[in-house]
Amino acid sequence: MEPAEDSLGATIQPPELVRVPRGRSLRILLGLRGALSPDVRREAAALVALAGPVFLAQLMIFLISIVSSIFCGHLGKVELDAVTLAVSVVNVTGISVGTGLASACDTLMSQSFGGKNLKRVGVILQRGILILLLCCFPCWAIFLNTERLLLLLRQDPDVARLAQVYVMICIPALPAAFLFQLQTRYLQSQGIIMPQVIVGIAANVVNVGMNAFLLYALDLGVVGSAWANTTSQFFLSALLFLYVWWKRIHIHTWGGWTRECFQEWSSYTRLAIPSMFMVCIEWWTFEIGTFLAGLVNVTELGAQAVIYELASVAYMVPFGFGVAASVRVGNALGAGNADQARCSCTTVLLCAGVCALLVGILLAALKDVVAYIFTNDKDIISLVSQVMPIFAPFHLFDALAGTCGGVLRGTGKQKIGAVLNTIGYYGFGFPIGVSLMFAAKLGIIGLWAGLIVCVSFQAFSYLIYILRTNWSRVAEQAQVRAGLKSTKELIPTPADLPILEREVMDGVILPDIIRPESQTGQLVVEENSQCAVPTVGEVLTGRQLVFYRGMALTVSVAVLIAGIVVRVFNDRG
């Protein structure tokens, strides 16, 4: 390139060009162009607008249990240990189950709303209410025997007895907590998040006030804190219901209670059960890890408790992006827009990855001081600082895995997530962590090293699966779930046949497959309509509905009765 002259006659030297291989240069330019395209920027803004309030709402819910621990911690060590164990029991055997089962709505509601089959969203909510209320009975059976379970785990008898008192008071709170989970999904599928934040703030104000009044004014101790927690759960559910009713958010999606809510339970549970395992496997692993840390020594337990709290708070950011992913991807697929779903998926992974990287760097930089938020014990602080360099990369992989899980929920592929979670945690990571913890005598440092194996396996497996996703095919399946297309309209290619066979387990019913619960059903589908609520799959007759739903109720109640019998037997023994 020859030198040129400007308007004043000065010589302008051409800039030096950096020689880059043509293929590599093209890839870099295309990557930058894609990352900075208007579509990606708009999508990132939409995702952040969803993820931010979800983070705040989740933080508000998390604070309710933390407040109970803080108040009871001032009563004494036994009271603090009892409340900590009681909250763990409620979370592991109750809240985690409801959270997982309600996650089926992330798929069904978001896809139906995206496909403009609005009344179907309300029917799915009704279906979820009935199924989750039935699931309360088995959870209550475990609640009734909390003391016995804790004694089997070699916990202090006084702590176990007091924990049983706390859990018993929380029994009526479980249906309220489940209903709140469903209400949250109902609003999230429509892109409505802020009401949960407002309600969460109000519930925390009520919780703090009731804890102070019941513990100090009435001197009720742990019992008072339990009642404050239970009241807060009812307050959350009731206030959110009143908000929906007052703002008339339900007008277009709620057609009143209908017999349709008794149909399609198989489709719901095919998504709900894998969703439950996606949530519970990880949740249970951390709770078990905390228990194992207590078997080493008190310092290890204290450090594990601190890191667990930090992990819970840090995970709320990718959790928010996971919810945003399930909503945006589900809405796009329900509308049949495969390109938008792909864009949402790519953008949310970039956003979550950047945020997780920043959080990981921050925690690593603050590794020597972050534990002072929770304790002044020098030994615990020192151990936490040793684990933080391991936790930082753990959080990055965990964030990617959690966000990918949101994408899988949006696409209706929870079964894949459940299988990969099981393999990652119980096939590889957790056994390695326990071996390093005890055999290698590394304590919780070894445990978290094993957990990195879990989440890295999850993250890479999820990413590979998502990269291989046929978005056009998934969009067609989403429209079947949304009641907009018949499965007969899906024209398979020979390569699709193995996939189609698996879709029966993912909630998409093929016309040539007969459900075990119906012999004479017919496929009913109506085209895109805001009023019609088609039943996807076979329609059960009235007699079949009474039999199968009656059996579900009978089994649930029988489990509760068995729990009562075990409790009575143990009390007499």
Curated annotation (Swiss-Prot):
It is found in: Cell membrane. Optimum pH is 8.5. Active from pH 6 to 8.5. The chain crosses the membrane at residues 47-67, 82-102, 123-143, 162-182, 197-217, 226-246, 267-286, 305-325, 346-366, 380-400, 416-436, 444-464, 546-566. GO terms for biological process: organic cation transport; xenobiotic detoxification by transmembrane export across the plasma membrane. The keyword Cell membrane applies. Expressed in testis; especially in testicular Leydig cells. It is a multi-pass membrane protein. GO terms for cellular component: plasma membrane. Keywords: Antiport, Cell membrane, Membrane, Transmembrane, Transmembrane helix, Transport. Residues 68-81, 144-161, 218-225, 287-304, 367-379, 437-443, 567-573 are extracellular. One of its GO terms (molecular function) is polyspecific organic cation:proton antiporter activity. Its main location: membrane. Residues 1-46, 103-122, 183-196, 247-266, 326-345, 401-415, 465-545 are cytoplasmic. It comes from the Eukaryota. It holds the Pfam family MatE. Multidrug efflux pump that functions as a H(+)/organic cation antiporter. May mediate testosterone efflux from the Leydig cells in the testes. PANTHER family: MULTIDRUG RESISTANCE PROTEIN. Belongs to the multi antimicrobial extrusion (MATE) (TC 2.A.66.1) family. This is Multidrug and toxin extrusion protein 2. It comes from Mus musculus (Mouse). The lineage of its organism: Eukaryota, Metazoa, Chordata, Craniata, Vertebrata.
